[in-house]
Amino acid sequence: MKVLILGSGVIGVTSAYYLAGAGHDVTVVDRQPEPALETSFANAGEVSPGYSSPWAGPGVPVKAVKWLLMKHGPLVIRPKLDPVMWVWLLKMLRNCTSARYAVNKSRMIPIAEYSRDCLRDLRRDIGIQYDERSQGTLQLFRHQAQLDGTGEDIAVLKQYGVPFEVLGREGCIAVEPALAGVKEKFAGGLRLPQDETGDCHMFTQALAKHAQALGVRFMFNTGIDRIVTDGARVSGVVTSAGVLQADAYVLALGSWSSRLVAPLGISLPVYPVKGYSITVPIKDASGAPESTVMDESYKVAITRLGNRIRVGGTAEISGFSSKLYDARRATLDHSLTDLFPRGGDLSKATFWSGLRPMTPDGPPVIGPTQYANLHLNTGHGTLGWTMSCGSGRVLADMLSGKKPEVDVSALTVDRYAHRFG
């Protein structure tokens, strides 16, 4: 079957790889000159099934007010006269209940864990390299009250069988020795030993080459204008290279997915939430993190990627703006220098922002639409890297007529037919 994939981020490329492996004739279209140059370019670097949770949860509205007032707060809202933004925020607030949180998290954990297993299979099968490490992740609590308040999180981890360790100061230092010099700045941590780290951009570029070896064709520097339909089917995609036609179509355009399907009558509440990162050359290896340390107070992840440190964080709701703000850079700088003062050379850091494709309830949107030959693979939010391989494989199984190895029936766009979407 001839399949056209729109988007060459990590979701589009994993979808292409698995579809080609299943014997399909695959073409990937993207406006960029290479794969993974937008949201997949410089994310925090975590492959963290254990942290696969909805942003919408009980207590979040109250916390949001506090975050908005903090100097280095993790949340920024830049109000716009955009009804889509406000409708999306309202839908998110409707999901901030214990009952909805439990349902939404139960939909996220299986695909995240399956995806990590698929990633491990890829490493074994094709030897792909991407500055990967399998040393777990550490959620660091600066205050004892934060550590004491982990009961609900631990209960959820137990419920889903996710291995964890609650660590005091010395336990944190044992897994992250560079923290020894700042031990007065934290009370303890929660470690997830099965989580991994790696460079998403490096991975996606490498997997694209493997996909090409399987026959995948990439059409870069190609703008995507609109989708054309004929009754209950998609008949083509209008691009800067002309109208492209296939037997099946996969939409993996991240935050831009909603705009493309809205004219088709598909209500897809995926909205961009901007994240920022800095990438810092390691100055002193003994002063750098071994894996990922999540600074819970500022919601900042500090990750070692080869000879670099990636520092990522902030949730900025400001539409499709990619503008870089110095205040957001200051938050990332502060978290790094406060916890790993000897680790990186900030004078040589690069500053970046990307638009995370967020759903109001948390889980991604994977599966068929009202058009028989149009499938969605989008809305992964902060977990695109974590969920990428599993999402791509599930999508390939669907189009190949196979039953996916993990149940994703609750991840289709149809779930937004009820009021919580």
From Swiss-Prot:
EC number(s) per entry: 1.4.99.-
Cofactor: FAD
Function summary: Oxidative deamination of D-amino acids.
A matching Pfam family: DAO
A GO cellular component entry from the record: plasma membrane
Oxidoreductase recorded as keyword: yes
GO BP terms, alphabetized: D-alanine catabolic process
Reactions listed under catalytic activity: a D-alpha-amino acid + A + H2O = a 2-oxocarboxylate + AH2 + NH4(+)
Family: Belongs to the DadA oxidoreductase family.
GO molecular function terms listed in the Swiss-Prot or TrEMBL record: D-amino-acid dehydrogenase activity; potassium ion transmembrane transporter activity
Domain of life according to the entry: Bacteria
UniProt xrefs under HAMAP family: DadA
Alphabetical keyword list: FAD, Flavoprotein, Oxidoreductase
Species: Bradyrhizobium diazoefficiens (strain JCM 10833 / BCRC 13528 / IAM 13628 / NBRC 14792 / USDA 110)
Lineage, opening ranks: Bacteria, Pseudomonadati, Pseudomonadota, Alphaproteobacteria, Hyphomicrobiales
Binding sites annotated in the UniProt record for FAD: 3-17
Protein name: D-amino acid dehydrogenase
Gene designation: dadA
